[in-house]
């Protein structure tokens, strides 16, 4: 009887010591700061005839 009582007591103590993992959402929202600088350049190459047309007819663009 004492052995059974000791076994039950020790098993209850061991069950109480098992690790528990808890996953919970954070209280504050997650913020991601991205400092991105985007630069682009458009290069247009035109023939001389097209350049003259663009100079004379500036209303095209």
From Swiss-Prot:
<comment type="function">
    <text>Involved in outer membrane lipid homeostasis. Interacts with the inner membrane protein YdbH to form a functional protein bridge connecting the inner and outer membranes of the cell. Is required for YdbH's function and may facilitate phospholipid transport through the periplasm.</text>
</comment>
<feature type="lipid moiety-binding region" description="N-palmitoyl cysteine">
    <location>
        <position position="17"/>
    </location>
</feature>
<keyword id="KW-0564">Palmitate</keyword>
<comment type="similarity">
    <text>Belongs to the lipoprotein YnbE family.</text>
</comment>
<protein>
    <recommendedName>
        <fullName>Outer membrane lipoprotein YnbE</fullName>
    </recommendedName>
</protein>
<keyword id="KW-0998">Cell outer membrane</keyword>
<keyword id="KW-0449">Lipoprotein</keyword>
<feature type="signal peptide">
    <location>
        <begin position="1"/>
        <end position="16"/>
    </location>
</feature>
<comment type="subunit">
    <text>Forms multimers. Interacts with the C-terminal region of the probable phospholipid transport protein YdbH.</text>
</comment>
<keyword id="KW-0472">Membrane</keyword>
<keyword id="KW-0732">Signal</keyword>
<dbReference type="Pfam" id="PF13617">
    <property type="entry name" value="Lipoprotein_19"/>
</dbReference>
<dbReference type="InterPro" id="IPR025985">
    <property type="entry name" value="YnbE-like"/>
</dbReference>
<feature type="lipid moiety-binding region" description="S-diacylglycerol cysteine">
    <location>
        <position position="17"/>
    </location>
</feature>
